[in-house]
A protein has these predicted regions:
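Transmembrane signal-anchor helices characteristic of membrane glycosylation enzymes that use polyprenol
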Residues: 3-33, 216-224, 282-287, 403-406
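Active-site lumenal/periplasmic loops and adjacent helix-entry segments of GT-C-fold
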Residues: 6-147, 152, 360-365, 415-422
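Transmembrane alpha-helix segments characteristic
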Residues: 14-16, 208-216, 266-298, 327-352
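Membrane-interface alpha helices of multi-pass inner-membrane proteins
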Residues: 163-179, 190, 211-222
């Protein structure tokens, strides 16, 4: 394929990815379950001219300490004179779509340009990527930076002096933006270095680059982001010294052991189509596991309704199942070095039930290297076709990707009952909470709590108000995430919340029981605002009962 054709096709894929990520902005009043908190922090930055960190009363313990997204959105709104909510909710997912050209740049380090282009097409419609990054969130904006960090580190492996400055700049950007993206990007770089060392490289500069990255990350996470440090120490149960020393010890051990790591020589299969078909059928068994045993590390069932939405990504992921074809590429081993640490961290999260390394959160990050592997597999199959049959063969992949685009937003029932979209009725009810007396606690599920906090400027309950919502009895007090124990003032309910109360990330949303729903018709709860499909109830104080 000529360079001009390749550039035009990449542009078309990037525009398609942009349109796909923004498509749900037209379907909902707001899209994104944490939008309220992000808007609250961004508005505080614009209004006060300083980052709100200490004393933050929201749910996200990491949000105040990683405000790169808020800085970008606030700067754009001030410079362009655009409304802050529109700037945040449209600019961030649009900027996140730059991950597609970023993947193409990174992909050319590992596979051919055509294979990287095919990988971009797969990545652009992968529903774990689209769904996760289609709303304003730091992870979506950090996605292009993470891919570019991998790209720069591949350059550090070959030409350290030239690529160390870009690597450092991207590292600093990720430090400000998103901790989880930084963790997985650096983990991928570490895996690449391990296999590069096993292949015979003795350069010291890449080790210095990763040691510097580990030191800067430790300084930021442990030294500066005090609230985040408390969360890490509490969730892991590890001593501070272990967290500080573990990355450097791991790098030292890798420096000693990686040269002794044997790299097997794998031949490219003569009939890869059979291997790809077998991989696709095996993936169906994995779906069956999810139906029987839930998503690893969670209590969220997959369910047979998810099968139509999983088939398109599984169709192209099967093309990544030929290691011999991948290793025949210019950077095949490096590509596996990028992938395997992410797989390992996901496995740890799934096996231990860790709430820091939730297994399904790794899926969007795995899609990038796997898409490049799939691109290599597809190009190998394409070359095996006779010239007259190649257009039809390419059209078959295009049809799979089109199906992927059409199924990139699974319904609530498929997503464990989790609802990312906010209706006009819910938004109107949330905005009305601005008339509620200051200091009153509003109880709702995770999504509406975020909006009541961010738009209504009220303390909210998030998952800690579960008993107020789901129990048949009356609950008077709630322990909030950061504002201490407070008396319940109001309860915010909508038809969507009644259909599925979203609480913890690792538990499926459950509908309100008939007994729990009935109590809101009692004298204890009076509807002070009713938009038809969303109600704000005032809970009577105990002294009045």
């Amino acid at each position: 394929m000529a360079d001009r054709q390749r550039a035009l096709l990449l542009g078309a894929i990037a525009l398609g990815a942009l349109a796909l990520r923004l498509s749900h902005q037209w379907r909902w009043a707001l899209w994104g379950s944490d939008s309220g908190e992000y808007l609250f922090l961004t508005a505080a930055l614009v209004g006060e001219g300083a980052l709100l960190q200490d004393g933050y009363l929201g749910w996200g313990r990491a949000y105040p300490w990683f405000q790169g997204m808020q800085i970008l959105a606030a700067s754009a709104a001030l410079l362009c004179g655009t409304p802050l909510p529109a700037t945040l909710f449209w600019l961030i997912p649009a900027a996140g779509a730059l991950a597609v050209p970023a993947l193409f740049l990174a992909g050319r380090r590992f596979v051919s340009s055509d294979a990287a282009l095919v990988g971009c097409g797969c990545y652009a419609v992968a529903f774990p990527v689209v769904y996760a990054n289609s709303h304003a969130m730091p992870g979506g904006l950090a996605d292009p930076l993470g891919l570019l960090l991998v790209y720069a580190f591949a350059g550090v492996l070959a030409a350290p002096r030239r690529w160390a400055p870009p690597f450092s700049i991207l590292l600093l950007g990720l430090l400000l933006m998103h901790h989880f993206t930084l963790l997985l990007a650096v983990a991928g770089c570490t895996g690449m270095l391990a296999l590069e060392t096993a292949a015979g490289s003795r350069r010291r500069a890449p080790y210095f680059a990763l040691a510097t990255a580990a030191a800067l990350t430790a300084l930021y996470w442990i030294g500066y982001a005090t609230g985040f440090r408390t969360a890490i120490l509490g969730d892991t149960g590890l001593p501070l010294g272990v967290l500080l020393g573990a990355p450097l010890v791991a790098l030292g051990a890798m420096r000693l052991l990686a040269p002794r790591l044997p790299l097997p020589s794998l031949q490219a299969p003569r009939r890869p189509a059979r291997l790809f078909l077998g991989a696709f059928l095996a993936s169906l068994l994995i779906i069956g596991y999810g139906i029987v045993y839930d998503v690893p590390g969670t209590s969220i069932p997959v369910g047979p309704d998810a099968v139509p939405f999983l088939l398109p990504p599984l169709g192209w992921l099967a093309l990544a199942a030929a290691p011999g074809l991948v290793l025949a590429q210019r950077g095949g081993w490096l590509l596996y070095g990028w992938t395997l640490p992410i797989v390992g961290l996901a496995a740890v999260g799934g096996l231990t039930g860790s709430h820091l390394l939730i297994a399904y959160r790794h899926a969007p990050y795995l899609m990038a290297p796997l898409a490049l592997m799939a691109g290599a597999g597809f190009m190998a199959l394409l070359r095996m076709q006779t010239p007259p049959h190649r257009p039809r063969f390419a059209a078959s992949l295009a049809s799979i990707l089109l199906c992927g685009a059409l199924t990139a937003y699974p319904p609530v029932a498929v997503m464990g009952g989790f609802q990312e979209g906010t209706t006009n009725a819910e938004l109107g009810c949330v905005l009305w909470t601005g008339q509620v007396e200051p200091g009153a606690l509003i109880v709702s599920d995770h999504r509406l709590s975020s909006l009541a906090f961010g738009l209504g400027k009220h303390n909210a309950s998030w998952e800690q108000g579960a008993d107020v919502l789901v129990s048949a009895g009356i609950v008077r007090e709630v322990s909030t995430p950061a504002a201490g124990t407070q008396e319940v003032g109001y309860v915010l309910l909508s038809d969507e919340v009644r259909a599925g109360v979203t609480l913890l990330q690792w538990e499926a949303a459950q509908p309100l029981s008939a007994e729990a729903a009935a109590k809101f018709d009692s004298a204890t709860y009076s509807a002070v605002y009713d938009s038809g499909r969303c109600q704000l109830y005032r809970q009577a104080p105990d002294s009045l009962m």
